[in-house]
Amino acid sequence: MRPSGRKTDQMRKVSFERNFSKHAEGSCLVKFGDTHVLVTASLEEKTPPWLRNSGKGWVTAEYGMLPRSTNERMKREAASGKQGGRTQEIQRLIGRSLRAVVDLQALGERQISIDCDVIQADGGTRTASITGAWIALHDCLKWMETRNMIKVEKVLKDHIAAISCGIFAKQPVIDLDYLEDSSAETDANFVITGSGGIVEVQGTAEGAPFSEEEFLTLLGLAKAGCSELVALQKQAIA
């Protein structure tokens, strides 16, 4: 039995609140159960130096957690003067995931910066960030389209969503919360497009290795979960 009482293939309640920030071109408050992340998408009329005069744009991401988003207060990374390895890994993952479904040539020489700030953490912050970031990115591109800068359908090639899966109490489960994540025998994150393409898989065994059969079971859970998340994204932007 899962601590939350959920079935092995049951995700937490997921919601998207669009236009949460009045300043950003695109924004979304995404909730995966008790994990809440505020995502903003900001348009900048510039590109990284290595892309100048290439005709291509860029999508990048930053990720952070509020000090009291967790059980005990964490120090702000800014106070220590540097980002931790986990933060850098997650924000690169978010950026890679979004770029996988963006035509950078069609975006033109512009940069969209995605900021993911975890307000409350209960497991799955990176997967919630990616899934909510797609909404914020979509709305930023819609803002651009209303100003005749781009056509959304030419820039945004597909949906992208992410979900965690793992083996908890010897059972393959989807969308792990903190209690499950902290004691799971296997923990994996999957990033999958709306058309079923796999963008990234991160999998780690804690203690004993997991089998190919177990991995394929987790992949099956993830594909079903991401399909459900994409359906919720479509519903949110309708």
From Swiss-Prot:
Leading EC class? transferase
Q: Which reaction does it catalyse?
A: tRNA(n+1) + phosphate = tRNA(n) + a ribonucleoside 5'-diphosphate
Q: Does the keyword Transferase apply?
A: yes
Q: InterPro entries annotated for this entry?
A: ExoRNase_PH_dom1, ExoRNase_PH_dom2, ExoRNase_PH_dom2_sf, PNPase/RNase_PH_dom_sf, Ribosomal_Su5_D2-typ_SF, RNase_PH, RNase_PH_bac-type, RNase_PH_CS
| Pfam families named among the record's database cross-references | RNase_PH, RNase_PH_C
Sample GO molecular function, one term: tRNA nucleotidyltransferase activity
Q: Which domain of life does the UniProt lineage start with?
A: Bacteria
* SUPFAM superfamilies named in the record: Ribonuclease PH domain 2-like (SSF55666), Ribosomal protein S5 domain 2-like (SSF54211)
Q: Which UniProt keywords apply?
A: Nucleotidyltransferase, RNA-binding, rRNA processing, Transferase, tRNA processing, tRNA-binding
Which processes are annotated in GO (biological process)? rRNA catabolic process; rRNA processing; tRNA processing
Q: Which family does it belong to?
A: Belongs to the RNase PH family.
Q: How does it assemble?
A: Homohexameric ring arranged as a trimer of dimers.
Q: Which HAMAP family does the UniProt record give?
A: RNase_PH (MF_00564)
Q: What does this protein do?
A: Phosphorolytic 3'-5' exoribonuclease that plays an important role in tRNA 3'-end maturation. Removes nucleotide residues following the 3'-CCA terminus of tRNAs; can also add nucleotides to the ends of RNA molecules by using nucleoside diphosphates as substrates, but this may not be physiologically important. Probably plays a role in initiation of 16S rRNA degradation (leading to ribosome degradation) during starvation.
- Mind telling me what this protein is named? Ribonuclease PH
Q: Which organism is it from?
A: Agrobacterium fabrum (strain C58 / ATCC 33970)
